[in-house]
């Protein structure tokens, strides 16, 4: 499938389903967001959370800070914006320029290491499109949840798979999920480092429920996940953001029409016991 065939077939999200994004331009929804869904996914996530103005929220893997601004703007919460790859200076300048310097604190650190937060400090933890890279085990959940208040919420929204890989696929991954990135990242094993870790919504629900620390409140696959992927691919192409990603995404979408697993999106919200 080429891009012109995609234009003819791909759909656009129904903006009426996302009142949280009323007034947002398409650029504001997608720009500087990492992973599938962008602020459409963030909007779905906050619907499942119980947050009030003044609550302290950890935005885990905040990327370039758009989700932190979204949380601060829509919910009036105080945000600790943490990312491994984005500098705190960049984030601070961005938050200040957008009018949120006193509401969002940026930090550059590795969330898998010892954390500089007090025990039970956060009212909620929010994580969009990064949790699968490091969070798919009980040990990490125990490490992270020390800093969440009892009764506080952990909300994760992420790229996910419709089905688990079969044993045969784990041995011989589908070509659309096993490829090399363009230089200088050509040595990255995308299957081992990303897709193999994504799993299904049920897998994540079982992990959260089985850790003994969380009660799962909501877990569901987005019914318009396919549409959100389609729209973002067209956005990337129109803005010449990442031609390689456009090409591989087109292949993944077309492959998913006829094979499993296909790419999807989900949210899971749980409460600390």
Which role does the model predict for each range below?
Residues 195-212:
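Short alpha-helix
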Residues 138-153:
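A short glycine-rich, Lys/Arg-flanked "PGG" loop and its adjoining helix->strand segment in the class I
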Residues 218-273:
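Conserved Class I S-adenosyl-L-methionine
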Residues 1-49, 66, 155-186:
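Conserved class I S-adenosyl-L-methionine
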Residues 124-136:
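A short SAM/SAH-binding and catalytic strip from SAM-dependent methyltransferases
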Residues 115-125:
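A short acidic, Gly/Pro-enriched loop at the edge of an enzyme's catalytic core
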Residues 64-113:
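Class I SAM-dependent methyltransferase SAM/SAH-binding core
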């Amino acid at each position: 499938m080429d891009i012109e065939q995609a234009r003819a077939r791909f759909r656009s999200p129904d903006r009426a389903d996302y009142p949280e994004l009323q007034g947002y331009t398409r650029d504001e929804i997608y720009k500087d967001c990492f992973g599938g869904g962008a602020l459409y996914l963030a909007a779905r996530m906050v619907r499942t959370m119980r947050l009030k103005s003044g609550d302290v929220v950890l935005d885990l893997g905040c990327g370039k800070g758009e989700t932190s601004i979204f949380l601060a703007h829509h919910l009036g919460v105080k945000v600790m914006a943490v990312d491994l790859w984005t500098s705190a200076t960049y984030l601070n300048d961005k938050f200040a320029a957008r009018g949120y310097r006193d509401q969002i604190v940026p930090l550059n650190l590795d969330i898998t290491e010892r954390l500089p937060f007090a025990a039970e400090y956060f009212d909620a933890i929010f994580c969009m499109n990064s949790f699968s890279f490091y969070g798919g085990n009980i040990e990490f959940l125990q490490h992270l949840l020390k800093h969440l208040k009892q009764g506080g919420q952990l909300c994760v929204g992420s790229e996910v798979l419709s089905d688990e890989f079969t044993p045969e696929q784990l041995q011989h991954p589908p070509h659309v999920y096993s490829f090399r990135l363009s230089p200088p990242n050509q040595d990255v094993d995308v299957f081992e480092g990303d897709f193999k870790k994504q799993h299904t919504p049920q897998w994540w629900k079982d992990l959260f429920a089985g850790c003994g620390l969380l009660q799962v409140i909501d877990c569901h696959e987005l019914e318009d996940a396919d549409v959100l992927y389609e729209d973002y691919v067209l956005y990337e192409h129109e803005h010449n953001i990442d031609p390689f990603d456009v090409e591989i995404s087109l292949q993944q979408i077309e492959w998913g029409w006829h094979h499993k697993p296909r790419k999807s999106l989900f949210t899971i919200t749980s409460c600390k016991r």
